[in-house]
Amino acid sequence: MSARTKARKRALDVLYVADIRGESIPATLAVEQQRAAAEPDRQASWQYAREIAEGFVAHQDEIDELIETYSVNWTLARMPAVDRAILRIGIWEILFNADVPHGVAISESVDLASSLSTDESASFVNGMLARIAATQA
């Protein structure tokens, strides 16, 4: 597993935990930073995970509005928390990280959904992110 793939999973953990516990993302990041500092092998993935989470916080309103706009028959509150977190990461990478090709952002998000969410989540995530990426072409 690449460092970036691990970082996406760590960012997912941060966004998911903050969402489920009703905590702020910066507070959850601070806890994760303490864990990462205690485990030097986590440092490589930690840097990008933090960039993703902080990037989402900076653009949360815009990203969440896109999710609401492009999800058919689903509101943010109604979709599984893990799907919300995955979509937030994927959209941030598509819109705000020029170093990540759209196809990679979509593929990585779909892989996370396939392994961590419902049977329908992978196709839902794929469709949403593909539509959003198409607006950026």
UniProtKB/Swiss-Prot annotation:
One CC-aspect GO term: cytosol
Alphabetical list of SUPFAM superfamilies matching this protein: NusB-like
Protein name: Transcription antitermination protein NusB
HAMAP family xrefs: NusB
Keyword annotations of the record: RNA-binding, Transcription, Transcription antitermination, Transcription regulation
Role, per record: Involved in transcription antitermination. Required for transcription of ribosomal RNA (rRNA) genes. Binds specifically to the boxA antiterminator sequence of the ribosomal RNA (rrn) operons.
GO terms of molecular function: RNA binding
Family as reported in the entry's similarity comment: Belongs to the NusB family.
Pfam family, one: NusB
Any single biological process term in GO: transcription antitermination
Gene name, Swiss-Prot/TrEMBL: nusB
Segment forming the signal sequence: none
